[in-house]
Amino acid sequence: MTPARVVFICCVVLLAAAAAAASSSTAAGITRADFPPEFIFGAGSSAYQVEGAFAEDGRKPSIWDTFSHSGYSVDGATGDVTADQYHKYKEDVKLLQDMGVDAYRMSISWSRLIPDGRGAVNPKGLEYYNNLIDELLSHGIQPHVTIYHFDFPQALQDEYNGILSPRFVEDFTAYADVCFKNFGDRVKHWSTVNEPNIEPIGGYDQGILPPRRCSFPFGVLSCDNGNSTTEPYIVAHHLLLAHSSAVSLYREKYQATQGGQIGLTLLGWWYEPGTQDPEDVAAAARMNDFHIGWYMHPLVYGDYPPVMRKNVGSRLPSFTAEESKRVLESYDFVGFNHYVAIFVRADLSKLDQSLRDYMGDAAVKYDLPFLKSNNEFPLGLTSDFMTSTPWALKKMLNHLQEKYKNPIVMIHENGAAGQPDPSGGNTYDDDFRSQYLQDYIEATLQSIRNGSNVQGYFVWSFLDVFEYLFGYRLRFGLYGVDFASPERTRYQRHSARWYAGFLRGGELRPAAAALAGGGAYSQ
């Protein structure tokens, strides 16, 4: 390590310590009343991760059922039962009410509602989502509904290779129509798709997510088929066209009478330069264009970012004039799932390679903490990659404010994970999570005061759930779930008690005595 690097790291550590001290003092008096009156606080989950009942009442497999049953998640975990919300939704809604949230972010399982992906609607699936939505509303909780959250119907995957085919756009629009028609009288906040800027990379470049398509030498896992140099861009294009098609349908057919809002939800890593070398600064900006701008640029300006057009070339699909017009401003809000900052450096040599995937086109290199080796998780994944970097949230929101016309933003996911109690018991003490959430809620308020148009914040997650590749090794829940119990017993963690107190008017960072009992934190 060079002396300059040592000095740089020492400066970063000192600045971080000073920032933490300042944060503790400035946030002490913050309460919910400091946020705009209509600001929404909530918590979330998604269908495959929380529902269970994977083969009950007419539901058919999604690509995540196929993937997890093939053993690709840690410990061979699946979402077959998970937290069993399908059978316990009334209990869960009562917990949400007790916590005092304004809203619950949920998703609909396409293969539960329309088991074959198109055609007949499953009456039992329709009944379940009607019951859940009605239960939420009867307890004063707004349903914020995602139409597609990774769980694509396996039937359509088998029929035409799923999202890789343009046929997906028509089928998704028809599925969205069923959702709007049956639930839109009560659902006023719709997200079309969740994290469409990560599914193409994980599923069609690296092969670590379903449907496991990739090509040598880019796949993290070996894949039977795919093309990592082209398919991620095709899939992202189809997701964007499907989103805009569903938005057009909603606006033309439903919005005037139902009075709801519609958008989509992006993953919002923030890319930061690893050094202040101009090439590294440019690399971070380029990576933010490839990550956030991949969707925001078409939504705000009608086409992909110029740097993507330049670097990807003919492999990047083009919009027709009609498609560009439809994509442009096809949102009332944009959701962001934000957790961490990632540091990158330039690697312009990648642009000289004859074969390039997404990372090659971005021409950056980075050492993601979750690519460390010699750990217990598959694919080099570790549990410590979500360190607290609230400054990154502020930078991301400022970026949206300055570059993308300051859209209405809903922070749809933000949270911290812990591992299960090694003794086999239930982990109640999760003060690290409370601290993490306090940091990010304060950062959200600071961004609002700086002019960002943030209108909601949702903790990920309401309950412990099936965390995809991590299975049940990572627990994000405000409420824990005893997965060893057939009843999937819920239990309140310290963070749930703190969040409830804050939502009832308590201070963001209460004194220990306040948390011990009495007042807003008495639950």
Swiss-Prot record:
SUPFAM superfamilies attached to this UniProt entry: (Trans)glycosidases (SSF51445)
Binding residues annotated for a beta-D-glucoside, in chain numbering: Q49, H149, N194, E195, Y339, E413, W460, E467, Y468, F476
Molecular function per GO: beta-D-fucosidase activity; beta-galactosidase activity; beta-glucosidase activity
Entry keywords, A to Z: Disulfide bond, Glycoprotein, Glycosidase, Hydrolase, Signal
Top EC group: hydrolase
Alphabetical GO biological process terms: carbohydrate metabolic process
InterPro entries the UniProt entry points to: Glyco_hydro_1 (IPR001360), Glyco_hydro_1_N_CS (IPR033132), Glycoside_hydrolase_SF (IPR017853)
EC number annotated for this UniProt entry: 3.2.1.21
Keyword Disulfide bond applies: yes
First and last residue of the signal peptide: 1-22
Residues annotated as catalytic: E195, E413
Keyword set includes Glycoprotein: yes
PROSITE patterns, A to Z: GLYCOSYL_HYDROL_F1_2
Superkingdom of origin organism: Eukaryota
S-S bonds: C214-C223
Residues annotated as glycosylated: N227, N450
Reaction equation(s) it catalyzes: Hydrolysis of terminal, non-reducing beta-D-glucosyl residues with release of beta-D-glucose
Family: Belongs to the glycosyl hydrolase 1 family.
Name of the protein in its database record: Beta-glucosidase 31
Record organism: Oryza sativa subsp. japonica (Rice)
Lineage of origin: Eukaryota, Viridiplantae, Streptophyta, Embryophyta, Tracheophyta
